[in-house]
Amino acid sequence: MKIEPITGSEAEAFHRMGSRAFERYNEFVDLLVGAGIADGQTVVDLCCGSGELEIILTSRFPSLNLVGVDLSEDMVRIARDYAAEQGKELEFRHGDAQSPAGMEDLLGKADLVVSRHAFHRLTRLPAGFDTMLRLVKPGGAILNVSFLHLSDFDEPGFRTWVRFLKERPWDAEMQVAWALAHYYAPRLQDYRDALAQAADETPVSEQRIWVDDQGYGVATVKCFARRAAA
């Protein structure tokens, strides 16, 4: 089954939404700080979308060597244009998170590999985590934050999710897109199994998966692992 990239008007809509809500990235940035992000490191952002995270991170850590990768050529174009508008010289490239093809020069080189709100779209979830672990250097870390399937929400969580969608300043098309994102998202056990499968190929010294709604308003799954030192 082939994953479909976000293109055209949908890509533009995601960029408009992301560029107007930088505060929604605060929790993820805090998680990255906890994972040890620091100036001078190499960081790869898989499924980077239109590059909002890159703008935020390089504003806080100006010496990062940051590479954004996305399957959508439209998203890559938008990200490059957006970075130029913000006066940033950033690298964005076309690539599939489910394969390191096109990222061979980065294999085993990154201090940190991240992805935010994207792995729910993957058709081969273990392959996504495999790519993350292969890109990160021994001793480096990966961090993924993703949507949960609705079946993992308890009743209060589901009510919060419904209220969250209704309160977003989105048009009907975007509300449907986000609702479907959760409906088709993997279950919590799927994330656990996928990370464990990837770790069988590239050993890790630490891994943790947890769920909370901190900083976002709706429960999301956080997946962290540290590649075993050589």
UniProtKB/Swiss-Prot annotation:
Could you say which EC number(s) this protein's record lists?
Answer: 2.1.1.-
Keywords assigned by UniProt? Antibiotic biosynthesis, Methyltransferase, S-adenosyl-L-methionine, Transferase
Q: Which CDD domains match?
A: AdoMet_MTases (cd02440)
Extract the SUPFAM superfamilies matched here. Answer: S-adenosyl-L-methionine-dependent methyltransferases
Task: Kindly give the Pfam families that the UniProt entry links to this protein.
Answer: Methyltransf_25
From the UniProt record, give one GO term of the biological process aspect.
antibiotic biosynthetic process
Q: In which pathway does it act?
A: Antibiotic biosynthesis
Can the keyword Transferase be found in this entry's annotation? yes
* InterPro entries, sorted: Methyltransf_25, SAM-dependent_MTases_sf
User: What is this enzyme's class at the first EC digit?
Assistant: transferase
Q: Among its keywords, does the record have NAD? A: no
- Top-rank lineage group of the source organism: Bacteria
GO MF, one term, reads: methyltransferase activity
General function of this protein: Mediates C-methylation at the 8-position of the aminocoumarin moieties in coumermycin A1 in the biosynthetic pathway of coumermycin antibiotic. Active on both mono- and bis-amides for mono- and di-C-methylation adjacent to the phenolic hydroxyl before it is glycosylated by CouM.
**Which PANTHER family does the UniProt record give?**
TRANS-ACONITATE 2-METHYLTRANSFERASE, TRANS-ACONITATE 2-METHYLTRANSFERASE-RELATED
UniProt record similarity statement: Belongs to the methyltransferase superfamily.
Please identify the protein, giving its name as recorded.
C-methyltransferase CouO
Which species expresses this protein natively? Streptomyces rishiriensis
Print the organism lineage. Answer: Bacteria, Bacillati, Actinomycetota, Actinomycetes, Kitasatosporales
Question: Coding gene?
Answer: couO
